Amino acid sequence: MNGHMSNRSSGYGVYPSQLNGYGSSPPYSQMDREHSSRTSAKALYEQRKNYARDSVSSVSDVSQYRVEHLTTFVLDRKDAMITVEDGIRKLKLLDAKGKVWTQDMILQVDDRAVSLIDLESKNELENFPLNTISHCQAVVHACSYDSILALVCKEPTQSKPDLHLFQCDEVKANLISEDIESAISDSKGGKQKRRPEALRMIAKADPGIPPPPRAPAPVPPGTVTQVDVRSRVAAWSAWAADQGDFEKPRQYHEQEETPEMMAARIDRDVQILNHILDDIEFFITKLQKAAEAFSELSKRKKSKKSKRKGPGEGVLTLRAKPPPPDEFVDCFQKFKHGFNLLAKLKSHIQNPSASDLVHFLFTPLNMVVQATGGPELASSVLSPLLTKDTVDFLNYTATAEERKLWMSLGDSWVKVRAEWPKEQFIPPYVPRFRNGWEPPMLNFMGAPTEQDMYQLAESVANAEHQRKQDSKRLSTEHSNVSDYPPADGYAYSSSMYHRGPHADHGEAAMPFKSTPNHQVDRNYDAVKTQPKKYAKSKYDFVARNSSELSVMKDDVLEILDDRRQWWKVRNASGDSGFVPNNILDIMRTPESGVGRADPPYTHTIQKQRTEYGLRSADTPSAPSPPPTPAPVPVPLPPSVPAPVSVPKVPANVTRQNSSSSDSGGSIVRDSQRYKQLPVDRRKSQMEEVQDELFQRLTIGRSAAQRKFHVPRQNVPVINITYDSSPEEVKTWLQSKGFNPVTVNSLGVLNGAQLFSLNKDELRSVCPEGARVFNQITVQKAALEDSNGSSELQEIMRRRQEKISAAASDSGVESFDEGSSH
C-alpha cells in the first residue's frame, strides 16, 4: 500500500494465528516457547492443519489477524458522516488524492474485546470491549481497497462513535467480521456458542500454505544475483577516478557520443531525477502525517483530565512516530544526488528549469534538517559527494538563505572529491527507490561512466563479507535445516552501503587484496541460453519473510530457478522470490513478444571466457584497484550486449528537443576466440569480478579504435488533441508514466475537458497535478506548432476567395490589392 510496510515475519514459532488467522492458545510459558521454537516446520504445519479438525473444546478463544489500519472517522451528522457507506465514500475521496496512510498492525479477537497490537513492539495500541462495538461490517470490492473491515465503536466517555476502517489481505474481511460478530453474540450470553464454529469455518475457508516440501529450501543466490555481474564492474570508477585515469577514456567517449546516445543519457538521468523527487515528496508527506498525529495527540493529552489512555490514542501514538534514522539518511542522499543530476541537466530540462527545481528542493531540505534537530545527521552523510559542476551551479543559483542552509551542512555537502584526501574512501552511492524502480541500461557501449558504475562498488566492497557468509553456509549446508526458509531470510548479506567518514579504507580495499577460495556453484552462461519458463499459481501464497514472494491465485510467474522444492520466480511487477513448487502449474512458454520484458538490469554483458592469469610480454596484467596501480592492458575486442530500447521521456520534468540523426548505423562487431577455462573448474566470485573488470577496461581502451553508431529506435509517440476520447486520454496518461490514481481520476475526461483544467484544479484532483499540467502545456504547444501553418493557409485561402469574388464582380482581377492583404 502507501504506508510503511513492516518486513517482520510472524513465523510459526510464535503464534500461528498471526499468519492466517487460526486460533492460538493463551501465551505459553518460557519453557513452552523455547520448545516451540525448536519444533520442526513440518510438525508445526501438521499442528496448524489439525486446528480445523479438533473438537470444540480445543478451539482457542484468541485469534489474531494482520491488517492495515486505513483511517478513523467520527460519525457526526454535521460532517454528513452517519453510516459505514458514508465512511467508504470519504475513503474513496482521500484515496483519489493520495491521502490514505496505512499502518500495519495485528487485530486480536478474544471473548472480551477486540484489540489492536503493534507489529514490532507487540504493545497493545487500542482495546475495544465487545460491548462498545455497535456495528461490524465487511465491505468488499468497493474501491481500490477490496476487503475492508468496518468497526463502529463508542465508549461511555465518547459523545459520538468512531468508525475504524481496516484493509484485510491475508484473511478476508468477511471472515474476520464473522469472528467478531460471533464473539459479540457469545458475550451476550447466548445458549449456543457461535464462535467455535466460526473459527472452524475460518480455518476451512483460508487455504493457508501448502504442505512443506521434504527437501530443504534452495539456498538463495547471494550478492551475485542481487547485483549482476555487469553492474559489479562499476566499482572500477572508485579507484580509476582517484588515479586520474578515469577522465581520459570518458572525455574521448563524450567526443564520440552521437545525438542518439546523448538523448538516451539525458532521458535516463531525467527519469532518475523524477523518481528522486517522488521519493522526497513521499518522505515529506510521511513527516507531515507524523507531525499531524503528534499534534492531535498533544491536544488530546492537554484537554483530558485523567491519565487513562483515551480511544484512538494508541493508533495516534503509532502514527506519530517519526521515520527511522536510516530513512532520513536515504532522503539526504537523494537530495545530494538530485543536486548532482540538476547540475548535469541544467541545459537540457525546462518547465520547470533546473534552477527552479533547486529552489524547490531547498524547501523540503530545510524541513528534513529541522525534523532531525539540526544539521548533525545531514553532515554525517558523506556519499554521494557533490561534483564540481554542482557546487558551481549551487553557488550561482542559490539565494542567500538557501546558501546559508547549504553551508551549515558541512564539508560533506560543500567539498568535491579532489578536496578530500586521496586515501579517504568515499563509498559509491547506489540509489534505492521506494517502488523498486531501477534506472534503464543504456543501449550502447563505451568507456565506463559514473552512471554505469554505481552498483559494482557496493558488491565489491562487500565481497569479503560475502565470502565469509558463503563459507559459513557451506559449513552448515549438510546439517539439519528447516523445511522452510528461516523467518529472517537467507544467509546472504543485505547490508546497505557504508556511509560517512567512519568507513575504514583498509577494510574497504581488502576485497581487492585477496581472492576467495570459495567457488560460486552457479553456471550463469547455461542459464542465459535456456528458454524462459512460466508457471501459474494455483492459489494464494503469503510470504513470511523478505526472501519469499507473495502470489495470488492465477498469477503468471516466470521461473528463474526450479532445481529445488522451493522455486525462485518473478511476477509481472518484476519482484522475485521463493515459493513452494507444489502451488504452481507449469505453463507452455508464451509466444515471442508476449509477456513482460526483463527488468533493465537483468541484462548482463556477455562474459569473455578468457583465462584469468594470461600473461605475455605484449599483454600486461590488468590493473587491480588500490593501493598500487598496474600496467594498462592491451585492448581486446569485446562482445556487444543485447540492445535495450531507449527510455521514454519522463512525465514530470520535460527536456528540450535535441536534434538527432535518423541515419541508420550498425555496430561493428569484432570477434575473437579466447582460451576457455576447463569445464570442471568454476570461477570464484572475486575471479568473476576481476574478469569483468578486465573486460570492462578493454571496452574503454578499445573505444579509441572503433567508431560505431546506434540505430535510432522507432518508439511510437502517443499524443492527444482537443478531440481525443477518454480512452485516448487514459492511454496517454499511462504512456507518460503517471500512477494509477492519476490515470483513474483523469482518464474519464476527454481531450477538451483535460485541456480546460488549470494547475490548481489538477492538483485538487490528483497528487501529480503539477506534472500533468506540465505535460498538457507541452501538448498544447505541439498542437499550436502543428496547426499554425494549416490555419495560416486557411486564412489566406479565404482571403483570396474574397478578393477573387470582388474582382469578378468588378470585372478586374486586382492582384496588387490581394497581395497588399
UniProtKB/Swiss-Prot annotation:
Residue ranges of the region described as Helix bundle 4: 765-784
Post-translational modification: Ubiquitinated by the SCF(FBXW5) E3 ubiquitin-protein ligase complex during G2 phase, leading to its transient degradation and subsequent cell shape changes required to allow mitotic progression. Reappears at the midzone of dividing cells.
Compositional bias (Polar residues): 1-10, 17-28
Sequence segments annotated as region (Helix bundle 1): 717-737
Effector region as annotated region, ranges: 648-821
Protein's cellular compartments: Cytoplasm, Cell cortex; Cell projection, Ruffle membrane; Cell projection, Growth cone; Cell projection, Stereocilium
UniProt-annotated stretches for the region Disordered: 1-39, 204-224, 295-320, 461-525, 610-683, 800-821
Ranges of compositional bias, category Basic and acidic residues: 464-476, 670-683
Domain SH3: 530-589
UniProt entry keywords in alphabetical sequence: Actin-binding, Cell membrane, Cell projection, Cytoplasm, Membrane, Phosphoprotein, SH3 domain, Synapse, Synaptosome, Ubl conjugation
Span list, region Amphipathic helix: 679-697
One GO term describing the cellular component: stereocilium
Region Helix bundle 2, annotated ranges: 751-756
Molecular functions per Gene Ontology: actin binding; small GTPase binding
Biased composition, class Low complexity, residue ranges: 642-651
InterPro entries per record: EPS8-like, EPS8_2nd, EPS8_PTB, Eps8_SH3, PH-like_dom_sf, PTB, PTB/PI_dom, SAM/pointed_sf
Tissues expressing the protein: Expressed in neuronal cell body and neurites, and prominently enriched in the axonal growth cone. Expressed at the tips of cochlear hair cells stereocilia.
Modified residues (Phosphoserine): 58, 475, 624, 658, 661, 684, 810, 814
Modification Phosphothreonine occurs at: 223, 317, 628
Sequence ranges assigned to domain PTB in this UniProt record: 64-194
Consequence of gene disruption: No visible phenotype. Defects in PDGF-induced membrane ruffling due to defects in Ras to Rac signals. Dendritic cells are impaired in directional and chemotactic migration and are delayed in reaching the draining lymph node in vivo after inflammatory challenge. Mice show short stereocilia.
Role: Signaling adapter that controls various cellular protrusions by regulating actin cytoskeleton dynamics and architecture. Depending on its association with other signal transducers, can regulate different processes. Together with SOS1 and ABI1, forms a trimeric complex that participates in transduction of signals from Ras to Rac by activating the Rac-specific guanine nucleotide exchange factor (GEF) activity. Acts as a direct regulator of actin dynamics by binding actin filaments and has both barbed-end actin filament capping and actin bundling activities depending on the context.
Entry note about domains: The effector region is required for activating the Rac-specific guanine nucleotide exchange factor (GEF) activity. It mediates both barbed-end actin capping and actin bundling activities. The capping activity is mediated by an amphipathic helix that binds within the hydrophobic pocket at the barbed ends of actin blocking further addition of actin monomers, while the bundling activity is mediated by a compact 4 helix bundle, which contacts 3 actin subunits along the filament. The SH3 domain mediates interaction with SHB.
Similarity comment: family membership: Belongs to the EPS8 family.
Assembly description: Homodimer. Part of a complex consisting of ABI1, EPS8 and SOS1. Interacts with BAIAP2. Interacts with SHB and LANCL1. Interacts with EGFR; mediates EPS8 phosphorylation. Interacts with MYO15A and WHRN.
UniProt protein name: Epidermal growth factor receptor kinase substrate 8
Native source organism of the sequence: Mus musculus
Gene that this polypeptide is encoded by: Eps8
